[in-house]
Amino acid sequence: MCDVLTIRDLSKSFARNRVLNGVNFRMGKGAVVGLMGENGAGKSTLMKCLFGMYAKDTGQILVDGSPVDFQSPKEALENGVAMVHQELNQCLDRTVMDNLFLGRYPARFGIVDEKRMFDDSLTLFASLKMDVNPRAVMRSMSVSQRQMVEIAKAMSYNAKIIVLDEPTSSLTEREIVRLFAIIRDLSKKGVAFIYISHKMDEIFQICSEVIVLRDGVLTLSQSIGEVEMSDLITAMVGRTLDKRFPDADNTVGDDYLEIRGLSTRYAPQLRDISLSVKRGEIFGLYGLVGAGRSELLEAIFGLRTIADGEISLAGKKIRLKSSRDAMKLNFAFVPEERKLNGMFAKGSIEYNTTIANLPAYKRYGLLSKKKLQEAAEREIKAMRVKCVSPSELISALSGGNQQKVIIGKWLERDPDVLLLDEPTRGIDVGAKYEIYQLIIRMAREGKTIIVVSSEMPEILGITNRIAVMSNYRLAGIVDTKSTDQEALLRLSARYL
């Protein structure tokens, strides 16, 4: 039996930058192959070459033993190769069935046959054991449900190969279990998956094989039963990381940021939140998706209207009616949705690095190009951003490097309070370690840091204390050294 996918000596360059260099691998029917690598390693480029979004420079791609050279994603889909992107690209104001059959609506007498479309959708969902209403509007659905629709859409093309790019980045634990069940079920039917993820625990749970890219070169290709986590880390970063998390040796001082009885005005409403965070402390916020963690950070940064309660800084009551007020008090905020709220996608690295601190780069009342460039170069060096130059568009960078630029933007202001919402989501293990080191270094300098994370090992690995949110209320605050994952889960379900 021939392999469902074979890639031979595939190379791809952009200008003088070689992104893929002679990549070789193959996968059989029903295989679930994990694809790992640091941000910028070439994972996305490889998949875009497979999916017809990029033209390869050299090499060969074979599907079911036959050479293919897809010129577009449409052609790839029609030949059984589908891709579910991390950033779901859907028409949110249209129905599920509209999205399923977009561009290929069944017609009768020149008119869209909605009954057939509805019936075909029901049949498709039933075959995948999915309980989805074809007439539901996409906007009304959760991220996990929308993701299931994308997988169903792939199967409506009789997909042989489905690429999943960071599929669990916005899912709850229960939704991840459901996704894995669907992957296993389709795998038994012969559908092959390429599973792109930075979460090693998931790779070991769901994948039968794993491949690793580093700087465009394949550095590891093995059965999942033959590798250890340390092997994957070494293959990805080119060196051994003795520990998953750096030692948090920051010294915690007195209370600095205090919140008393805080409730917000508009839905979703926070209710009666009280906590205090100390100078030099790394304070974690944990909870299930939709528990109110992001909303609390937004309220602290002046992005949500406070109905009751108060916030104090160094013992003095403060008023936060806008993000401008928060910035004047030397607060910094890195949002969860970096592409939507954290950066200007059409701006350069220099623009995104300096935009939050423009008055500091003036000379004689005018912006100094020299100072702007020096600031960008300073943060590129400090944050180890992989880029061509400060003038490069931030959208051209990998997710991890984009996040480094966003954090660097705030470091230019030397903040006293740093609010980080999922700072390592979608970032490779090497970049994660660097961000952990940065967080600990800032805590050592006496900064007050609040970190939201959905990854329990991460929040237990880098924080001093953890507040657990449940249904927009504070369920409890625990000392990190004296708690565990089970205790965090119990607290997160307290008000459900």
Swiss-Prot record:
Assembly information from the UniProt record: The complex is composed of one ATP-binding protein (MglA), two transmembrane proteins (MglC) and a solute-binding protein (MglB).
Compartment annotation: Cell inner membrane
Alphabetized InterPro entries for the sequence = AAA+_ATPase, ABC_carbohydrate_import_ATPase, ABC_transporter-like_ATP-bd, ABC_transporter-like_CS, P-loop_NTPase
Name of the protein in its database record: Galactose/methyl galactoside import ATP-binding protein MglA
Recorded GO molecular functions are:
ATP binding; ATP hydrolysis activity
Which ranges carry the ABC transporter domain?
A: 5-240, 243-496
Give the keywords, sorted.
Answer: ATP-binding, Cell inner membrane, Cell membrane, Membrane, Nucleotide-binding, Repeat, Sugar transport, Translocase, Transport
Q: Which organism is it from?
A: Treponema pallidum (strain Nichols)
What function is annotated for this protein? Part of the ABC transporter complex MglABC involved in galactose/methyl galactoside import. Responsible for energy coupling to the transport system.
What is the superkingdom listed in this entry's lineage? Bacteria
Taxonomic placement? Bacteria, Pseudomonadati, Spirochaetota, Spirochaetia, Spirochaetales
Q: Name one Pfam family in it.
A: ABC_tran
**Which annotated residues bind ATP?**
G37, E38, N39, G40, A41, G42, K43, S44
Documented EC number(s): 7.5.2.11
